[in-house]
Regions:
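The feature marks non-catalytic terminal segments
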Residues: 195-269
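Residue-level detector of flexible, active-site-proximal loop/helix-junction positions
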Residues: 78, 104-106, 165, 181, ...
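Short, basic, helix/turn surface patches
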Residues: 117-131, 164-169, 218-237
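ATP-dependent adenylation/nucleotidyltransferase module used to activate substrates
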Residues: 1-150, 154, 184-192, 267
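Electropositive phosphate-/nucleotide-binding environments in soluble metabolic enzymes
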Residues: 4, 8, 117, 180, ...
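Mobile, glycine- and charge-enriched loop segments
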Residues: 98-110, 172, 243-259
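Catalytic subdomain that performs nucleotidyl-dependent activation
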Residues: 63-69, 142-221
Length: 269
Protein backbone atom coordinates (compact mmCIF):
# COMPACT_ATOMS: atom_id res chain seq x y z
CA UNK A 1 0.00 0.00 0.00
CA UNK A 2 1.27 3.47 -0.83
CA UNK A 3 1.96 5.85 2.06
CA UNK A 4 -0.16 8.39 0.15
CA UNK A 5 -3.26 6.33 0.89
CA UNK A 6 -2.55 6.50 4.64
CA UNK A 7 -1.74 10.22 4.75
CA UNK A 8 -5.18 11.80 4.82
CA UNK A 9 -4.10 15.46 4.58
CA UNK A 10 -1.98 14.84 1.51
CA UNK A 11 -4.57 12.53 -0.02
CA UNK A 12 -7.43 15.00 0.45
CA UNK A 13 -5.47 18.01 -0.83
CA UNK A 14 -4.16 16.20 -3.90
CA UNK A 15 -7.46 14.60 -4.87
CA UNK A 16 -9.25 17.94 -4.38
CA UNK A 17 -6.92 19.69 -6.82
CA UNK A 18 -6.90 16.83 -9.34
CA UNK A 19 -10.69 16.72 -9.48
CA UNK A 20 -11.53 20.40 -9.06
CA UNK A 21 -9.31 21.41 -11.98
CA UNK A 22 -10.00 18.26 -14.06
CA UNK A 23 -6.27 17.66 -14.35
CA UNK A 24 -6.30 14.05 -15.51
CA UNK A 25 -8.41 12.57 -18.29
CA UNK A 26 -8.79 8.95 -19.41
CA UNK A 27 -5.93 7.95 -21.66
CA UNK A 28 -3.61 10.79 -20.62
CA UNK A 29 0.11 10.11 -20.80
CA UNK A 30 1.67 12.06 -17.93
CA UNK A 31 5.35 12.93 -17.60
CA UNK A 32 6.50 13.88 -14.08
CA UNK A 33 9.58 16.08 -13.71
CA UNK A 34 11.49 14.45 -10.86
CA UNK A 35 14.10 16.81 -9.42
CA UNK A 36 14.74 14.78 -6.27
CA UNK A 37 13.29 17.47 -4.00
CA UNK A 38 10.59 16.71 -1.42
CA UNK A 39 7.71 18.00 -3.53
CA UNK A 40 8.64 16.13 -6.69
CA UNK A 41 9.10 12.88 -4.75
CA UNK A 42 5.69 13.36 -3.13
CA UNK A 43 4.11 14.14 -6.51
CA UNK A 44 5.50 10.94 -8.00
CA UNK A 45 3.97 8.85 -5.22
CA UNK A 46 0.65 10.72 -5.27
CA UNK A 47 0.16 10.12 -8.98
CA UNK A 48 1.37 6.52 -8.66
CA UNK A 49 -1.23 5.94 -5.94
CA UNK A 50 -3.92 7.78 -7.91
CA UNK A 51 -3.40 5.29 -10.73
CA UNK A 52 -4.32 2.53 -8.29
CA UNK A 53 -7.40 4.45 -7.12
CA UNK A 54 -8.63 4.82 -10.71
CA UNK A 55 -7.93 1.17 -11.44
CA UNK A 56 -10.13 0.18 -8.50
CA UNK A 57 -12.85 2.63 -9.55
CA UNK A 58 -12.63 1.50 -13.20
CA UNK A 59 -11.90 -2.24 -13.19
CA UNK A 60 -11.95 -2.42 -16.97
CA UNK A 61 -9.48 -4.97 -18.36
CA UNK A 62 -8.92 -2.62 -21.28
CA UNK A 63 -7.57 0.02 -18.92
CA UNK A 64 -10.09 2.72 -19.84
CA UNK A 65 -10.17 5.56 -17.33
CA UNK A 66 -6.57 4.97 -16.28
CA UNK A 67 -3.63 7.15 -17.30
CA UNK A 68 -0.06 6.26 -18.15
CA UNK A 69 2.80 7.83 -16.22
CA UNK A 70 6.53 8.24 -16.68
CA UNK A 71 9.21 10.32 -14.97
CA UNK A 72 12.06 12.38 -16.35
CA UNK A 73 15.23 13.17 -14.40
CA UNK A 74 17.24 16.08 -15.81
CA UNK A 75 20.82 16.23 -14.55
CA UNK A 76 22.75 19.42 -15.23
CA UNK A 77 26.39 18.35 -15.21
CA UNK A 78 28.06 19.85 -12.14
CA UNK A 79 30.83 18.38 -10.06
CA UNK A 80 29.45 15.98 -7.43
CA UNK A 81 25.93 16.26 -8.88
CA UNK A 82 24.71 12.72 -9.39
CA UNK A 83 21.01 11.98 -9.81
CA UNK A 84 21.50 8.34 -10.76
CA UNK A 85 20.19 7.21 -7.34
CA UNK A 86 16.81 8.55 -8.48
CA UNK A 87 16.98 6.30 -11.53
CA UNK A 88 17.60 3.27 -9.31
CA UNK A 89 14.66 4.29 -7.14
CA UNK A 90 12.37 4.59 -10.19
CA UNK A 91 13.49 1.17 -11.37
CA UNK A 92 12.55 -0.29 -7.99
CA UNK A 93 9.10 1.33 -8.23
CA UNK A 94 8.60 0.03 -11.73
CA UNK A 95 7.99 3.52 -13.12
CA UNK A 96 8.93 4.23 -16.73
CA UNK A 97 11.75 6.75 -16.56
CA UNK A 98 14.17 8.80 -18.63
CA UNK A 99 17.54 10.09 -17.45
CA UNK A 100 18.77 13.12 -19.39
CA UNK A 101 22.17 14.67 -18.70
CA UNK A 102 22.94 18.20 -19.89
CA UNK A 103 26.58 19.28 -20.12
CA UNK A 104 27.04 22.82 -18.74
CA UNK A 105 30.67 23.22 -19.82
CA UNK A 106 29.71 24.70 -23.19
CA UNK A 107 28.16 27.79 -21.57
CA UNK A 108 30.33 30.79 -20.73
CA UNK A 109 27.95 32.16 -18.11
CA UNK A 110 25.53 30.54 -15.74
CA UNK A 111 22.21 31.91 -14.48
CA UNK A 112 18.89 30.72 -13.12
CA UNK A 113 17.26 31.55 -16.46
CA UNK A 114 19.77 29.32 -18.25
CA UNK A 115 19.11 26.40 -15.87
CA UNK A 116 15.34 26.77 -16.25
CA UNK A 117 15.52 27.09 -20.02
CA UNK A 118 17.75 24.04 -20.43
CA UNK A 119 15.59 21.88 -18.19
CA UNK A 120 12.41 22.96 -19.96
CA UNK A 121 13.80 22.14 -23.38
CA UNK A 122 14.99 18.73 -22.23
CA UNK A 123 11.65 17.93 -20.60
CA UNK A 124 9.70 19.02 -23.67
CA UNK A 125 11.92 16.98 -25.98
CA UNK A 126 11.39 13.87 -23.84
CA UNK A 127 7.61 14.45 -23.84
CA UNK A 128 7.55 14.87 -27.61
CA UNK A 129 9.89 11.95 -28.29
CA UNK A 130 7.90 9.46 -26.22
CA UNK A 131 4.38 10.72 -26.85
CA UNK A 132 3.46 12.26 -23.49
CA UNK A 133 0.51 14.67 -23.50
CA UNK A 134 0.68 16.11 -19.97
CA UNK A 135 3.56 17.53 -17.91
CA UNK A 136 3.22 17.33 -14.11
CA UNK A 137 5.18 19.81 -11.98
CA UNK A 138 5.47 19.78 -8.21
CA UNK A 139 4.85 23.34 -7.01
CA UNK A 140 2.90 23.31 -3.72
CA UNK A 141 0.49 25.71 -2.01
CA UNK A 142 3.24 27.57 -0.15
CA UNK A 143 4.98 28.25 -3.47
CA UNK A 144 1.70 29.31 -5.07
CA UNK A 145 1.11 31.74 -2.21
CA UNK A 146 4.66 33.12 -2.45
CA UNK A 147 4.20 33.58 -6.20
CA UNK A 148 0.97 35.48 -5.54
CA UNK A 149 2.65 37.78 -3.00
CA UNK A 150 5.60 38.41 -5.27
CA UNK A 151 3.36 39.47 -8.14
CA UNK A 152 1.57 41.93 -5.84
CA UNK A 153 4.66 43.28 -4.06
CA UNK A 154 7.03 43.49 -7.02
CA UNK A 155 4.93 43.72 -10.17
CA UNK A 156 1.74 45.43 -9.03
CA UNK A 157 -0.31 42.60 -10.52
CA UNK A 158 -2.44 39.73 -9.28
CA UNK A 159 -1.29 36.39 -10.62
CA UNK A 160 0.15 33.06 -9.65
CA UNK A 161 1.00 29.72 -11.24
CA UNK A 162 -1.87 27.98 -13.02
CA UNK A 163 -3.00 24.53 -11.95
CA UNK A 164 -4.08 23.16 -15.33
CA UNK A 165 -3.15 24.96 -18.52
CA UNK A 166 -2.71 24.09 -22.17
CA UNK A 167 0.58 25.12 -23.73
CA UNK A 168 0.02 26.60 -27.15
CA UNK A 169 1.77 24.99 -30.09
CA UNK A 170 3.25 22.24 -27.93
CA UNK A 171 0.27 19.86 -27.85
CA UNK A 172 0.76 19.57 -24.10
CA UNK A 173 -1.06 20.38 -20.90
CA UNK A 174 0.76 21.40 -17.74
CA UNK A 175 -0.67 20.40 -14.37
CA UNK A 176 0.28 21.10 -10.75
CA UNK A 177 -1.46 18.43 -8.64
CA UNK A 178 0.08 19.69 -5.36
CA UNK A 179 -1.51 23.14 -5.73
CA UNK A 180 -3.50 22.66 -2.50
CA UNK A 181 -0.79 20.78 -0.55
CA UNK A 182 1.08 22.51 2.25
CA UNK A 183 4.86 22.29 2.24
CA UNK A 184 4.91 21.02 5.82
CA UNK A 185 2.45 18.26 4.93
CA UNK A 186 4.68 17.17 2.07
CA UNK A 187 7.76 17.21 4.32
CA UNK A 188 5.96 15.10 6.93
CA UNK A 189 4.86 12.60 4.28
CA UNK A 190 8.35 12.31 2.78
CA UNK A 191 9.90 11.76 6.22
CA UNK A 192 7.30 9.19 7.27
CA UNK A 193 7.57 7.30 3.99
CA UNK A 194 11.37 7.44 4.06
CA UNK A 195 11.55 8.76 0.51
CA UNK A 196 14.99 9.65 -0.88
CA UNK A 197 15.56 13.38 -1.23
CA UNK A 198 18.40 15.00 -3.14
CA UNK A 199 19.49 18.61 -2.76
CA UNK A 200 20.36 20.63 -5.85
CA UNK A 201 24.06 21.13 -6.47
CA UNK A 202 23.61 24.37 -8.40
CA UNK A 203 24.88 27.26 -6.21
CA UNK A 204 23.21 29.96 -8.32
CA UNK A 205 19.81 28.27 -8.16
CA UNK A 206 20.14 28.02 -4.39
CA UNK A 207 21.10 31.69 -4.02
CA UNK A 208 18.21 32.75 -6.23
CA UNK A 209 15.68 31.23 -3.81
CA UNK A 210 16.37 33.91 -1.19
CA UNK A 211 13.34 35.97 -2.24
CA UNK A 212 11.00 33.01 -2.07
CA UNK A 213 12.32 32.11 1.38
CA UNK A 214 11.68 35.69 2.54
CA UNK A 215 8.09 35.61 1.28
CA UNK A 216 7.48 32.27 2.96
CA UNK A 217 8.76 33.75 6.23
CA UNK A 218 6.22 36.57 5.88
CA UNK A 219 3.47 34.01 5.35
CA UNK A 220 4.64 31.93 8.32
CA UNK A 221 4.63 34.97 10.62
CA UNK A 222 1.09 35.85 9.55
CA UNK A 223 -0.06 32.25 9.95
CA UNK A 224 1.04 32.38 13.60
CA UNK A 225 -1.57 35.12 14.09
CA UNK A 226 -4.15 33.59 11.74
CA UNK A 227 -4.20 29.77 11.68
CA UNK A 228 -6.73 29.85 8.81
CA UNK A 229 -4.47 31.96 6.59
CA UNK A 230 -3.88 29.33 3.91
CA UNK A 231 -7.58 28.45 3.70
CA UNK A 232 -8.19 32.10 2.88
CA UNK A 233 -5.33 32.09 0.38
CA UNK A 234 -6.82 29.06 -1.40
CA UNK A 235 -10.13 30.93 -1.74
CA UNK A 236 -8.32 34.02 -3.02
CA UNK A 237 -6.10 32.37 -5.62
CA UNK A 238 -8.37 29.56 -6.83
CA UNK A 239 -9.85 31.71 -9.64
CA UNK A 240 -6.29 32.51 -10.76
CA UNK A 241 -5.28 28.86 -10.88
CA UNK A 242 -7.52 28.23 -13.87
CA UNK A 243 -7.80 31.77 -15.20
CA UNK A 244 -6.98 30.71 -18.75
CA UNK A 245 -7.39 27.48 -20.68
CA UNK A 246 -4.83 28.48 -23.30
CA UNK A 247 -1.40 29.84 -22.57
CA UNK A 248 2.07 29.90 -24.01
CA UNK A 249 3.68 30.91 -20.74
CA UNK A 250 4.40 29.03 -17.56
CA UNK A 251 4.58 30.90 -14.28
CA UNK A 252 7.38 29.19 -12.39
CA UNK A 253 8.31 29.49 -8.74
CA UNK A 254 9.47 32.91 -7.56
CA UNK A 255 13.23 32.51 -7.30
CA UNK A 256 14.30 36.08 -8.00
CA UNK A 257 13.13 39.45 -6.80
CA UNK A 258 10.34 39.38 -9.38
CA UNK A 259 7.80 36.84 -10.53
CA UNK A 260 9.48 34.85 -13.25
CA UNK A 261 7.57 34.36 -16.46
CA UNK A 262 9.19 31.56 -18.44
CA UNK A 263 8.20 31.09 -22.07
CA UNK A 264 8.02 27.54 -23.33
CA UNK A 265 9.33 27.58 -26.87
CA UNK A 266 9.82 24.78 -29.32
CA UNK A 267 13.47 23.76 -29.45
CA UNK A 268 15.11 23.61 -32.81
CA UNK A 269 14.96 20.21 -34.50
Amino acid sequence: MHYFIRHELLKHATLSALRLFSMIHPGDRILVHLSGGKSSMALLHCLHAYQEILQRENPDPGGKGVFDMGAVVVALAYENYDLLPLVNYLKALGVTHYYEKQDMNHYCSHSLDLCSSLKQKVIYNVARRYGYTVLALAQNLDEMAASFLSSVFNNGSIQTMEANVELKDLNLRLIRPLAFCREKTIAEFVKTAGLPVMKTACPICEQSRVEQVRLKEILAAEENNNPHLFSSIISAISPLLHLSSQSDIVLESDTTSQTKVITWTKPEN
